[in-house]
């Protein structure tokens, strides 16, 4: 029986997907792991572990590079929480344009004023006048599942939307509203946007992308929304921009000690995907991908290995994780041929320095074949299903 360990509370909808597995939070030496936010840097990897499924988009809590070297596939669930995050961003657009949070805090100070509350409200409300988002320009950095959803929703609310994504796929481009203008550079977005929202992963290239230099390119009084990762923004630069009025608001789903309590900084306690619907969607998607890989060797939505899936066409499937170097395929086919097997179907794809190969054969191979392939220089892991 397949052993699946969950490191966090996972939606019970995943239970049905794992009904034929030993699934729970006390499982030892697992074949697969389900995780949300648990830090895995110090997790001791057992000899059976072949995959980790993150019920969410970000994988910063998982040592992806180390797992890649070990042939452990890391999955995520892009788009499963897109609607939840989109709705939070739309909420934050209103919070950024109108001084709603300040006004709510002020109203709380009127407790105990009795019948005078109404008059005090009418007298004091002018301090909290804000602008509408209709007709304003929203800049969207990153046009993946969430960025597209935000762009389309904002356009439907009457905003002018400008987006930028150097990696925009044809499929994603077709999902964008025709009213959304795509430009080639972030700088073009910064210069025209009244609001800027970012939806990109945290990488060495994106860390600190919102700094003094980039904020200086923005319109005076712009609102910056960051629901992706706190490290995308230089907190000191943001605070300086808020103090001088270059930024009217900074709204983030990732509070930090520096930002908490800063005037015009709104820190939301990481609520982007915190809806029952998003948690269900992420859990189901992660569970299905994990089971499909364990049972069929198919890889869908992996952050460290290439997407490769195909229906089984033989009596057995040989799955090989290997370095992306020359002459690997020839050595695999030679080993299969030497074992007296016919190849019914074969596919190999690469992602950076690593690659993945599936070989469907006409009969179940003897254990020696897996050992022969594993001994080839550059092979990381071999599995026969």
Where are these regions (language model features)?
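An N-terminal-biased, well-structured beta-alpha scaffold segment characteristic
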Residues: 1-77, 191, 211-213, 217, ...
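Rossmann-like adenosine-cofactor binding region
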Residues: 38-43, 166-258, 274
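Phosphate-binding beta-alpha-beta segment of Rossmann-like dinucleotide-binding domains, i.e.
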Residues: 78-137, 301-302
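Oxidoreductase and adenylate-handling cofactor-binding alpha/beta cores
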Residues: 86-105, 152-159, 284-298, 333-337
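Glycine-rich Rossmann-fold phosphate-binding loop(s) that bind the pyrophosphate
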Residues: 143-144
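N-terminal Rossmann-fold NAD(P) dinucleotide-binding loop
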Residues: 147-148
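Rossmann-like dinucleotide-binding domain for NAD(H)/NADP(H)
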Residues: 212, 220-312, 321-323, 356, ...
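A conserved regulatory-domain signal marking ACT and ACT-like small-molecule sensing domains
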Residues: 300, 304-385
